Curated annotation (Swiss-Prot):
Binds 1 Fe(2+) ion per subunit. It comes from Lawsonia intracellularis (strain PHE/MN1-00). One of its GO terms (biological process) is tRNA threonylcarbamoyladenosine modification. Pfam families: TsaD. Belongs to the KAE1 / TsaD family. The keyword Oxidoreductase does not apply. Required for the formation of a threonylcarbamoyl group on adenosine at position 37 (t(6)A37) in tRNAs that read codons beginning with adenine. Is involved in the transfer of the threonylcarbamoyl moiety of threonylcarbamoyl-AMP (TC-AMP) to the N6 group of A37, together with TsaE and TsaB. TsaD likely plays a direct catalytic role in this reaction. This is tRNA N6-adenosine threonylcarbamoyltransferase. Its main location: cytoplasm. It is found in: Cytoplasm. GO terms for cellular component: cytoplasm.
Amino acid sequence: MLCLGIETSCDETAVALVENGKCIGSILGTQAPLHALFGGVVPELASREHYRCLGPLYDKLMEDAKVTLADLDVIAVTRGPGLLGALLVGLAFAKGLALASGKTLIGINHLHAHLLVAAIEEPIEYPALGLLVSGGHTHIYKIDAPDIFILLARTLDDAAGEACDKFAKMLGLPYPGGVIIDKLAQQGIPDPYLFPRPYIHNSELDFSFSGLKTSAAMYLKQYPQLIEEGQRYCSNNSKVAIKEELYNVCSSYLLAISETLYIKMERALQKYTNEIKTIIVAGGLAANSFVRQAMHNLAINYNKKILLPEQKLCTDNAVMIAYYGELLAEKGYCHRLDLSAIPRGQHIPDDMVKV
């Protein structure tokens, strides 16, 4: 089975081909330099860039892989969650291909795809406990099968990835700042008492990171020289000598986030410990060294198998869309052409048709 994947949920325009569980082609066009000028993603600009880039990227992918539209069995496209305008560009393109070719169309839940792409490298043993950590979402799922996801926890306010990007912005670092924070943090010595582990003094599995951001803002207000260090690093990058305090504060901040994720995942694991066979960590923040280490420690402590996608599969990509689309098609699922886009914050309906 050959599946085309299309991803346009935010600021990455991506297309990929997966055949029988293996990626045979993938192209990604990032808009990060454009949005960096504004300190974050501008939805209207993102939509226009998807519209400009998607067609040429598709043509190049098909040419490089030496396949045609007629060779495809399935067309999978992100239908949500994401920026509505951006989603509509990808959805319209996919529907056009499906209408012209008569191929199977499947709308993909972007969040579920993030978690299942780990299986492209190593099979998932179900049931699995999945942690999705990204700029827009922080969710814990119990995954009983590729088409059975049970949401156990979500963030009540800010996502973990957003908390990283906002901290980077406070320090005067460029967008997207999460990667830079991680790079700086790896050279620091974390202070485990500098920042709180938010929303842990309860029995809940849900997350809340707004208090951590507030704590960081208050700390930087006390020590404005850290902001000056961040701006110096930004202006001259690694060529300028940076004071160790900047490394240490970044390290302490990421330790607070990673330990919070550990605590909540441990609670979920204890609740289902006799059932869970695999821990999966996915999303953009799954590429963070502190998060990866914390989840490795969790898996070791509870003697569970852990799957962490390689870093290029942690951020938004079309490989995960094509891979998940193929899995669903093999189970007989598809969507009609009235498939709708679902923006962030709205429930994605279970409206697939089984044939």
